[in-house]
Amino acid sequence: MATARLRLLAILVALLLLAAACGSDDESADETETDDAAATDEGTEDDTEADEADEADAADDEAESADESAPAEVDSITVGYSAWPGWFPLAVTEQAGIFEEVGLDVELIFFADYLASIDAMAVGELDFVTQTLNDTMASVAFGDEQVIVVVNDNSTGNDKIICDGSISSIEELAGKTIAAEAGVVDHFLLVQGLESVGLTEDDIDFRGVLTDAAAAGFAAGEFDCVGVFAPFWLTALEREGSAELFSSADFPGLIPDHIVATREIVDDNPDAVQKLVDAWYLTLQYLEENPDESLEIMAEVADTSVEDYNLFADGTTLFSAEEALAAFGDGDDTSSLLFTAELINPFLVDSGFTESEAPIEGLFDGSFTEDWVNRNG
């Protein structure tokens, strides 16, 4: 009986030991599972954070890429131009997509009547207009706030004094009837020619007539001579026996041509001004690289054949950016805009076109051309 109890006790002890061992194993397993789960959770959290970081980096990269590829802010401007070989390239600027290339939305308006473009600028219908230095100074003398921002060209023969076959010298102009648009460049050219031989406007019978009408009137025999610019001198030379007496080629630098901005847009949106200046110089590059296409575009706007348009080539000298920048500087001859302006001011008053001289300070701003040269020179 005692032996049976001892055996039973031994069995109970063994069972207890076995249970304890199993409990210990379960706890170890639980701890191991817990540790493994914790490690898994930590790994998952690390992976999630890494994924989120990668996604953030990718988003930043996409944003940077988008910033780099996104077009610059588009500026909307209105530009007026008229019939002159130095301004016809603006039609190329438009048709070649150069305005869009630089970030401009441009309403480009062609004026068959040059004076109408000047008037449109004066009443605030335009942000920019193409004008001669004479007419810009006249506008400023009248109180308009304008700034010259581009030197397009110099007239080197496309402004002409044309006379009938009986007149062969400037001295012979005394007493003759001569038509030109009053107060503008060909009137100015005429006066310079007269003064070169000691004559004045009082020595002739001057008729102030719009350029297109003056050319047609001369061709019909209404005047002895006429002062006209391209393309209108083609009409004047239709008169039998007529010939050029002198031209802007005889007075280098006397007639510079420009893109003129309102003072308001220069002050309030210089970025738009810079874009337009950039567009102009990109256009000059385009003319060199695509001469045939460009010539066809310009001849179409000029309402003439390509052959006739080629006749204007030597009479207008387009300025490179470097040449334009030099013209903005000081000088002691007509290669300097400042010097030429000093010649024009008394003419405007003496001809009765303005009551007072135009203020020169602030009229010329070569900084936009200088910026182009610094970036592309």
What is each residue range found by the language model?
Residues M1-L9:
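Bacterial N-terminal signal peptides that target proteins for export
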Residues L18-A21:
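C-terminal motif of bacterial Sec signal peptides marking the signal peptidase cleavage site
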Residues G23-T32:
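Bacterial lipoprotein signal-peptidase II cleavage site
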Residues T44-I77:
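N-terminal low-complexity, Pro/Thr/Ser-rich intrinsically disordered segments
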Residues D67-L210, D224-A230, F246, G253:
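Short, glycine-/small- and polar/acidic-enriched structural segments
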Residues D127, N134, F206-R207, D212-A302:
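Pocket-lining segment of extracytoplasmic ligand-binding domains
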Residues D267-F353:
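Secondary-structure end/capping motifs
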Residues A341-G377:
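Conserved C-terminal helix/tail region of periplasmic/extracytoplasmic solute-binding proteins
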